[in-house]
Amino acid sequence: MTPSVPRASGAPPGGYRGSGNRSGPAYQPAFGAADRLGPPSRPESPRLRLTAAVWLAVWELARMLPESLVFGVADLGGRLAHRVSVRARARVARNLARVLPAATDAELSRAVRGAFRSYARYWVEAFRAADLDPADLDARTTTDGFAHLDAALEGGRGVVVLLAHHGSWDVAGRWAETHGYHLAVVVEVLRPRRLFERFVRLREAFGVEVVPLRRRGASGSEVGGPLGGGLQRVAAANHMIGLLADRDMSRTGVEVSLFGESAPLPRGPVVLSQRTGAPIVPITMLQRPGRRWHLQVLPAVDVDGLAPQAAVARVARALEQLVLLDPVQWHCFSPVWTADRPPRQRRSHAAPAPT
């Protein structure tokens, strides 16, 4: 049974403002995204089906075993993956070298190893997110910067939450829903489909609305396209829309400077903000020692009236600030910068906007 999202009234837990309008009808989330997708366009291979079965088995073990054991095994797995995954290790090193240009070789090596350990922890936390007791989650979480988010919501036009593959974003969604902040997230439809659908149901189980995005490699994959109506409905109800913005998966992004080097970034946050009037607010859930977290909200990004190039460049500055909160927690296991992408994935862009 999926939760409902009532009209905001009074103070949510902890005195946070919460999202939603103070008057008018209750918002009805569009849960059941996995059921509306329909079957995959082509049958999945036996290898993909086996991959799904293995991941789902690991998922169940992560939920069933004692917390200390699960996190200990995950940390060991992250260390092992760092040792044996030569290609991934090199890719993470290239990415983090841009973020930490002054790091020595030894410092960069430690950061890369830490990135693998952080990523392993992310997966365990995602698997266990729906089982987190709200009171326990609250006790383990500190927050900062919520004045930025609450001020943005006072405008009544929703908020575009600027996310990166950083920290533990599924735990952030769980925390948000237990404190009166309703979140809809745009996620790309991935294979194996069975595993993707499990993640959709996980997020919906604790109240996060999932908006699936099919990769098309054209303007149809942008949030300003076919998805726009559903997302605008969320914004009109003064709720939050989460968009991962540190990777251009559609190949229709805008080339801007990111940590001093050219990289394509998605235009979705800018398109949605300019169409709805919803401010862009960067947020991350930082992992802390002892299985604790810190939820950090950064100042809103003003893109009102800016051309796409300048607007996405401004978003890039916000992403830099977010990543620099703890570069080790940036799960940058894919090519980000243009120089690292295969030629077939590159396209002609305008010159990077000035910072």
Predicted regions mapped to residue ranges:
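Short loop/turn and capping residues at structural boundaries
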Residues: V73, L108-S109, V187, R214, ...
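Short Gly/charged-rich anion-binding patches and loops
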Residues: A57, R91, A147, V171, ...
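Non-catalytic C-terminal accessory region of glycerolipid acyltransferases
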Residues: T2-R7, G14-R17, R22-Y27, F31, ...
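Residue-level preference for nonpolar/small residues embedded in alpha-helices
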Residues: V54, A88, S168, L195, ...
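A conditional alpha-helix N-cap/helix-loop micro-motif detector
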Residues: A139-T142, H165-H166, P192, G217-G225, ...
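Membrane-anchoring hydrophobic helices of lipid-metabolizing enzymes
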Residues: P3-R7, P12-L163, F196-R201, G207, ...
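Catalytic core of membrane glycerolipid acyltransferases/transacylases, capturing the structured
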Residues: G155-A218, D248-V254, L258, Q287
